[in-house]
Structure formats: C-alpha cells, structure tokens
Amino acid sequence: MVTAEKSRIDCRHIDVLDGIRAVSVIIVLIFHFWQQTWIFPVIKTPWLASVGITKIDFSNFATVGYLFVDMMVLISGFLLFLPLMRSIILGEEMSGWKNYARRRIARIVPSYYFAVLLLFFASALPTGAYATTADALKDLFAHLTFTQTLWVNTYIATPLDVVLWTVAIEVWFYVLFPFVAEFIKGPRNKNRQSFTPAYGIFFIFAVFNIINYVYTENFVLKGNVYLAMRINQFPAFLGVYSIGMLGASAFVLIAKNCRRSRIFNAVNTLFSVCSILLIIYLINDCVATQERQVWQVTERSKLAFVFMTFIITTALSSKWYRWLFSNKFMRFLSGISYNLYIWHQWLAVQCKNTWRIPKWSGEIPPNMLNITYWMNRYAVVITVFAFAAAILATYLIEKPFANLIMGRPVFPLFAKKLLKTANSADEECINEEESAPLSAEVDSFADTVDSDKPAENAAANPWGEQETDRNDSDCD
C-alpha cells in the first residue's frame, strides 16, 4: 500500500535525470571513441543463443551518437524551466536573478575556463597551432566569450577542444532565459488578469519554433552551405528548448494533479520502455538515410519530443525502474559527466596522433590498418584517461571553485572533519566560553555543508538545477 507521502510526485529533485544524463554523455563518448578506434560496440551473448540472440549490436548508436547531445540540451532546458513552472503552477517563491546567475556561473565556468586556458597555453601555443597571433587571440577570445560557433576556425577547426561548442549554446540560453521567464510571468500590475502565464508559454513556444523553422529552411537547407557549421548554431536548438519548456510545465501539472499508485507507475514504466523502442527506431532511421546531417536538423524536434516523453515517463515510473537511472553509480557518473564530456575527445585525439599511446610507428594509424590488438589497447587507454581526467577535474576544479563562488566551504569533507574535531574539543573543554567561538564558526560551516543536500538545496534555491545536475552537456 502506498502512503500519501510516498504517493506524491517530487518535482524538485528528479532522480532519474542523473542516469539519463550519464547515459547520454556515455553514448556521445562512444561516438567520438568510435571515430578514433573504429571499434563497433558489439556485445556477444552466447548465453542467449538458445533464443536466437548471439549478439547485441550498438553500432548504430556509435555512428550517430552525436544525436544525444540534443538530449543533454533538452535536459538543461527542462531543468531551467522547471522552477518557473513550479512558481506559476504551485505558487512557489523564486529567488532573484542574481542568485540564478551565480549558480549558472558556478556550474559552467570553472571547468570550462580551466579547459580553455590549459589547452591554449599548454597545448595550442607551444605546438604552433596558430598561423598568426591574431588567430590565436581570436580563438581565445571566442572561447572565453562563448562565441566560438560563429566562425569556422574557432569552432570546427579550433586547436582547442571542439566539443566545447555545446557549452556555448547552453550559456547563450542561460542569458536569454531570464527575459523569457519574465515575459511568461507577465506584467506585474492590474493588467495581469488579461495576460496569463499560459499565453506566455504558448507564445514563446510558437516564437521559438518559428525562428527554428525559418533558420533551418533559409540558412541550413537552402543553397550551398556548410551543414556542419550551421546545424548546431543557437537558433537550431530553440525548438529543443521549447519542448523542454512544455515538458517542465506538463511534469509540474502532473505532479500537482496526480498521485503515484501501482497502476500509475506500471503504465508509465510501459510508456518509458516504448519511448526507448521509439528512440531506437529513430536512431536506425537516421543511420539508414544518406543525408544524416539533414535528417538531424529536420527531425530534431521530433527526436526531442520522444526524448521528453522518455524523461517524463521514466520519472513517473515504478521504483525499481527508476532505480536503474538513479542508483549510486549513476549519480557518480552524472557528477563527473560534465568534465567527462569536456575531456574525452581531446584526450582520444592526442593519445593517437600526438602522444602515440599505445606506441605505434609510421604514417598510417593502426586502426586504419585494422590492427585489432592495438585498437583494443587504445580503447582501454583513452577510456581510462578520460575518466581519470573527469574525476580529477570534477573534484579538484569544478566542485571547489563552485563552492567558492556559492560561498560554501571549498572542501566540504574537510569542514565536516573540522566539525567533528570541534565537537570532541567541546566535550573535553572545561571552559565553555573558550570553546564557543570555534564551535560557532564550525557550526556555520556545517550549516553550509548540510545545505548541499539535493532536496534542501533545491528548496533554498528554486532557481538552481538539482545538485547532481551536470550538462551537457551535455552536454554534446
């Protein structure tokens, strides 16, 4: 029997997003690794031979894994709009835009700037990657201002990290979002009754999709254009963000008006599985077409809608099914996914072409000669390097600097140990007045550390994404 408290749908911390984001980043990683290794991800299943299944082939996901960058962008948009929809539908109070900007900076900037500056000064400049000083300064300026997608030589041809373009797309939507949110909320005066948030939502949805359509038809599909340069510009993702907005409003409405039950959970589990099958169908359809980039841009909104359906139904599914996407391992992967996305491709390329790890000689890379033992060793090396870099960058750069920006202890574990030490000292201290200053100082640390818990932190900062949220980015 489900209690009233357990039957409520949590629209603050959506635990399954950890796993969905992690899986999306891993699929993008598989795509980039496949480009370098030429190894197709095929799992042999001799134990299933009796039922006619001798292997599970993920090759199609490898060849068009870049499509899951859209999933990362969609998750980002969904989470951005979620607090706004809670405010409109549930009447929750929102914190100010200053806190919003602070959280966005804390989440994005430390790891991103670290990667840009390290690669520029430690790799690109020493290796003479730029023809002129002007080219170098332009590339650096474009990346520091998140405008690298505007020029070919700072985007596709950059000697820095190409995958950082997705971060730039998200940052520009972060900049746009406050204006969109204020418009949706409507005027704060007596005329508010004539302009409800629902009108604002549908108006923004229409405007975003019109811009997306006009851009696609006139700047992507018409004429002799460089598709790779056009399909991932900011206007091409407005349709995806609009679907994230509708998904957030739908999810909060469901959370307000529905309660969990065995039948409710089971039905959503079934719909989630059907969504996965539909995603597989769309992936196969993309692989089957000759113009995959054209398919990507023309079917982007359709794919985003299926992704959104998968996200919502998975979040509303049965507990055992949600656990697949919200267990500790998935939370760990989600925690390092931003830096995993940032570093995986650059390290893979450097290992093969610059450092030649594993060792090889000659002019033709071993994967092009189908030297399988080298290809397998190389796949292991770049996987280890990517995860090692992600873990180090997350716990030595991203989290400490994010804590610093948010006014939290830079190293929370140290603060907790300090608290334990102070408590022990308090017990042994004869003079309570002498121990009070230290105890008060450490208690303030403890309050800050404890506020890092996902549910409590979401309540205190409704504009912030859930604490385990990482992009990506993917995203992508």
Task: Describe the residue ranges of each PLM region.
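C-terminal "closing" transmembrane helix and its immediate cytosolic amphipathic cap
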Residues: 1-9, 31, 321-330, 345-447, ...
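Functional transmembrane helices that form membrane-embedded active or gating regions
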Residues: 5-26, 63-64, 97-102, 108-109, ...
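Juxtamembrane loop-helix boundary motifs flanking transmembrane segments in multi-pass membrane proteins
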Residues: 5-8, 52-56, 89-97, 101, ...
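Kinked, hydrophobic transmembrane alpha-helices enriched for aromatic residues
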Residues: 11-84, 102, 106-128, 145-154, ...
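Membrane-interfacial segments
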Residues: 84-92, 122, 126, 130, ...
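Outer-pore turret/helix-boundary of cation channels
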Residues: 128-139
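Aromatic-enriched alpha-helical transmembrane segments of multi-pass intramembrane proteins
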Residues: 138-168, 173-303, 351-358, 363-385
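SF2 DExD/H RNA helicase N-terminal ATP-binding lobe
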Residues: 454-459, 463-467
